């Protein structure tokens, strides 16, 4: 998809703040600092539109990015950051569950994992959670440029096995640096949102 117009419409914490436009939505979820902002920036051909941060736990709201008035990317707060209080984590969990369990416009979720490491228990829980709500899932293994080509198949099978991916779940290896996987991610987004 050629992207020229992007706009951060709203940062929401409650359903009444979600956008009214009945556009399809794709959520992006993953651990803090897994590369959600880098994926968004790569997909929309911008360098720093979605703020990348060296400080984990920076995204604390559901950020709705309007893409060409055709769909929304919804950036979900990163999980697994230890310096966030238990109370704050519970608040985020409620906010995220409300969104995933009630949002009619949500067409699918991209779950990001760091391809250099085995997925964590929290990564596994996220996939289980998405399966529970019957949300189509694309798993994106990030930072693939840091893995030698000879070891990428091993990384891919490790992710599949640990996350217990079903035959309906797609897995794409991705690099924001080399743009590996960018077109495949867009193809998946277009297929589930029916936009192109």
UniProtKB/Swiss-Prot annotation:
Gene3D superfamilies: P-loop containing nucleotide triphosphate hydrolases (3.40.50.300). Its cofactor is Mg(2+). It comes from the Bacteria. HAMAP family: GTPase_EngB. Keywords: Cell cycle, Cell division, GTP-binding, Magnesium, Metal-binding, Nucleotide-binding, Septation. GO terms for molecular function: GTP binding; metal ion binding. Necessary for normal cell division and for the maintenance of normal septation. GO terms for cellular component: cytosol. Belongs to the TRAFAC class TrmE-Era-EngA-EngB-Septin-like GTPase superfamily. EngB GTPase family. This is Probable GTP-binding protein EngB. Mg(2+) binds at residues 37, 59. Residues 22-195 form the EngB-type G domain. NCBIfam families: GTPase_YsxC, small_GTP. GTP binds at residues 30-37, 57-61, 75-78, 142-145, 174-176. Pfam families: MMR_HSR1. The gene is engB. Disulfide bonds: none annotated. InterPro entries: G_ENGB_dom, GTP-bd, GTP-bd_ribosome_bio_YsxC, P-loop_NTPase, Small_GTP-bd. GO terms for biological process: division septum assembly. Coiled coil: none annotated.
